[in-house]
């Protein structure tokens, strides 16, 4: 423990004693100042004496010095002020130049953004490796399939129908049959489904379908006994699939009409998120392939055996985009929303297509005046707020687009009024045995809970056929390279065999040179030629024997007599005979034994006759 400090407390006697001494000291100082005032008075400048002869000149000189000092001080002050003003002007000029430069940069950025908006609202992937891979997989499915099922979204069938793919199939693969599957019929009114079926059946056989939405892995439910387009609301709202029975019957009719004894291969193509994988799972009644709401979930072709007669091929989603991309492509859920640069523009398109009453009923918000006002209210309701209490409009817009593609905002499109008759339909209908009669003559369209969109001639996205052509060229180049590699391998194998034969011949010749003279070598070469000729003849006889219908002709001793002689010579010289030659030799030996037995029997008979004659 440290040493304690002394206390500062003191007695009152000592305290007052100190105060008295201090007061006494102050009195003494005041008394001394009064008694000696000259010591404390400051001396004044006496100035120039009056008796100084040049007093006036001296005063003028002093005055001039004062004026000069004041002028110098004033000049310094003015110079300092001018310097500050010049520096301020330089700062203003630099600031103006900097502002002008930043303004030009801002204008350039705005022009670049405007160009990007005109060219497309999202970062276009182009012909990258993944897109080429998707097209290769789609091409494999089209080439392998006997029947091509193009799955369409019932809400916008023409928007997700790829006419370029259909044209390519009809031109390149004339033996392929195209069938349209109108999926997701539970998301649109029944009248609209019937109208679209009536329109699409003017081009290809078309079936309505509803995929299963059950979550279990096996034993997915199926409903049958009724046409899907005529099903009740309870059947449409259930989780079981509709239309599987009609589709399977159509495929069986196709195989029966063309007398196909093997299994029918069915290729399934379509835009992303139209329900291709869900269609396969509904037909298989198990979760055979994975499904997801993100475009591009299926990346490779997948084969699923439905039964011994039907084989299904799943393919990646087709994105046949060659030109610019507008809001319609984004609203069809063809591209990933994370890559969309301006998701507010598609939301503006959604609000323009739907009535405000419908939007207010769905999102339960107050009336809005603009798209930004709508997104701000939805962001506040869904708590999409960023730092500073600002609404996150981008993420809110993406969520609204997902509501549109996911079915939370119901909508449907009207088919065109002008129907284009097609000559291909009758041909397909006869082979597939599908009834193409008109379902209804007139239908009503009075449903306010849906966003009804009038049909506009859609700007069909052009398919970049160069991807398929490049794939063909690459396949041909690969085939040529493989053929060249096979030829090179065969040539190398032939050269290796010849080298081995030459080495064996050299070894045999060396041995013969050591054991015999030149005459023996000549004889050996002659024998070698005979062996080669015999081997060739044996090979020819073996190939001919496979084509003979009569089994007895294969081992005819008369036709193989020359071969028998040659094999005997080989056996005497080398002690080896080939398997085919050995078989012929065995047959010939058996024939010789039979002949020898007959001769011996004849000799015995002759001896018996001679003995009889002797007796």
Curated annotation (Swiss-Prot):
Binding site for GTP: 183-186, 270-277, 314-317
Keywords: Coiled coil, GTP-binding, Nucleotide-binding, Nucleus
Highest taxon, organism lineage: Eukaryota
Cell compartments where the protein resides: Nucleus
Biased composition (Low complexity): 525-540
Biased composition (Basic and acidic residues): 35-46, 54-111
Biased composition (Basic residues): 10-34, 562-574
Key word Iron-sulfur present: no
Primary location recorded for the protein, binned into one broad class: nucleus
Residue ranges occupied by any CP-type G domain in the UniProt entry: 135-321
The protein's name: Guanine nucleotide-binding protein-like 3 homolog
